Amino acid sequence: MSNSITLTLKNYLGRMPTINEYHMLKSQVRNIQKIMFFNKDIFISLIKKNKKKFFSEIKSSPSEIKTHILEYFLKQQKTSSIGKLYTIIELQTILVSSYTDVLGVLTTKSPYVFPSNIKYEPHSMKKIAHDILTSINVATISEKVMGRHNVSNLVTNVNLLMEEYLRRHNKSCICYGSYSLYLLNPSIKYGDIDILQTNSRIFLINLAFLIKFITGHNVMLLKVPYLKNYMVLRDNEDKHIIDSFNVRQETMHAIPKILIDNIYIVDPTFQLLSMIKMFSQIDRLEDLAKNQEKATIKLATLLEYVRIKHGIILNGNVTNMPMPASFNYEKRIVTVDASKYNFSFKKCFVYLDENSLSSDILDLNADDAIDFENVSNSVFLINDEVMYTYFSNTILMSSKNEIHEISARGVSAHILMYQILTDGDFLIPLSDIINSLMFKEKTPIFNIIPRDKKTGKHGIINIEKDIITH
């Protein structure tokens, strides 16, 4: 056994390593040295500054914060489990390697914010938005509580931090949803801030430690198997703090976005299509039944943005939207006629089962499928003027053989999202799909085709219990 490795492990573990510990941990010596040489005084100072700036009303003293930090950096001395030691080393390495650049930088002087003149007061759109939502408000109110509705008291503090984070890291992190629309229209209320970023795991681990060191309470990261590259941070009462989708850099580059007050948000045109698509998901219609007014102001803001940005006239005149679609129950495939538009395909096969799509793409022997990850929740393949894609929401039926217009429009919106992501033609179909929302009567739901059931285990990062599962 190497004397230098043995000495390093001895100093780190606070005891002489066993032979098993030596052989299992010797590959981690470089990381261990990085942890041991880490300037914890500077780190403690950064945490205190983060606390003062973003968590000022939380009652924890500087000495308590220091104790929480020092205790964690000595945690390896209280276990002999190799699995736990690996977890502690991995998490400590992430902290010492990335915290300063990810969250510590937020304590330095803020760069100048270039105030945006993009503000919308969509008074004229509220009536249109209200009428649209009234016509699709066809679900009954559900009493089940979704995880996104069970929010932590820490959300306000984390939102304050996120506003600064989005400005400092606007090349790698963008936002969408209610907060992004609040930046366009300050009358919109928001809860947590929805984000897409290229280093989601590192960010959330650092944030988890910041909260733990300030509050002294455990927080936990969960990876959900049925959402691609998604992680959620929950507090010690299992309440939602923040979640984040991770995307590759090339996907981030493809996302249409606009800059408001030094923060990049997903282009509201794309967000409008996403909203139309999500109305096909029965859960979202149940949310609408609970609070139509909340959705009205969001939709009105999106419509006003699109009207001004693209010069779209809202008069209800439309002939080709939603695109004609039929459903094959046995194959669980929606077939869409896209021939009326200037697309690179004439027909779309929209699969409700992702594995079936993957299998058929393999059979086609095609290797040019494009994956936009959770931005579209699907790959897209164009082959012989046919699009192959996956739709991750429920499909609503208005009769046994007829797709409900809400879902037909949702599928059409999904296809238009591809057009925008690939810089294809979309203005005429965009105008059509928006106008297809207007002057409609309610159509009851006859049947609901369930969405794809994803299997798999939840991944967990539990700092308190030294657990990382994938």
From Swiss-Prot:
SUPFAM superfamilies: Poly(A) polymerase catalytic subunit-like. It catalyses: RNA(n) + ATP = RNA(n)-3'-adenine ribonucleotide + diphosphate. It is an enzyme of class 2 (transferase). Disulfide bonds: none annotated. GO terms for biological process: mRNA processing. It comes from the Viruses. Keywords: ATP-binding, mRNA processing, Nucleotide-binding, Transcription, Transferase. Polymerase that creates the 3'-poly(A) tail of mRNA's. Heterodimer of a large (catalytic) subunit and a small (regulatory) subunit. This is Poly(A) polymerase catalytic subunit. It comes from Yaba-like disease virus.
